[in-house]
């Protein structure tokens, strides 16, 4: 839902940020597809690369060559913001010095910002298509928005498919 709002406001992923997305189950991937939310994630570079452990075990692929070279040459203290549980140095990539755990929605938000140095409680995350400052509160979904998605698309029948049994 954060990705949808960001796209609608005209945001793009920060070019310094490498993205990957590996939902924990086929059911989760199916729900995102049926809600249309996966389309927004795709536009920000969060295309599904696999189901389950891929990114967290270092299988997300290489960093951009120029970025990796800059990290090494200039001794950049590079960081990752991820929702997986492999948050120790070098686990998801050898060039990553620190990893911060966050909800998937915050991972998407930080992919736009491109830095962990912003204070989301007061700093603008950027400008919208009209040049207006956008803040965390402008893109974070309300309880009502979340409940609407859940009531429309989250059906118990999805939990009892053959795909769910494989998860």
Residue ranges and their predicted role:
Residues 38-52:
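A glycine-rich helix N-cap at a beta->alpha junction
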Residues 21, 48-51, 81-83:
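General beta-strand structural signal in soluble alpha/beta enzymes
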Residues 1-32, 36:
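Non-catalytic terminal/interface segments that mediate subunit docking, oligomerization
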Residues 12-14, 54-55, 59-157:
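Mobile "lid/hinge" segments at catalytic clefts and subdomain interfaces of large enzymes
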Residues 160-167:
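Conserved small/polar residues in nucleotide/adenosyl-binding loops
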Residues 29-34, 42, 60-68:
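Metal-dependent peptidase/peptidase-like ectodomains
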Residues 3-10, 45-48, 112-120:
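A generic secondary-structure signal for well-formed alpha-helical elements
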Residues 26, 52-54:
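Gly/Ser/Thr-rich beta-alpha loop segments that engage phosphate groups in nucleotides
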């Amino acid at each position: 839902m954060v990705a949808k709002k960001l796209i609608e406001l005209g945001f793009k992923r920060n070019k310094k940020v490498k993205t990957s997305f590996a939902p924990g189950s086929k059911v989760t991937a199916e729900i995102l597809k049926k809600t249309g939310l996966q389309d927004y994630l795709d536009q920000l570079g969060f295309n599904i690369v696999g189901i389950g452990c891929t990114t967290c075990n270092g299988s997300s692929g290489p960093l951009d060559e120029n970025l990796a070279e800059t990290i090494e040459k200039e001794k950049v203290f590079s960081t990752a913001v991820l929702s997986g549980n492999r948050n120790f140095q070098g686990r998801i990539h050898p060039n990553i010095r620190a990893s911060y755990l966050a909800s998937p929605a915050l991972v998407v938000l930080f992919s736009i910002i491109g830095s962990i140095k912003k204070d989301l409680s007061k700093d603008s995350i950027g400008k919208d298509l009209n040049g207006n400052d956008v803040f965390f509160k402008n893109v974070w979904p309300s309880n009502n928005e979340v409940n609407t998605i859940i009531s429309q698309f989250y059906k118990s029948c999805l939990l009892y498919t053959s795909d769910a049994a494989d998860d």
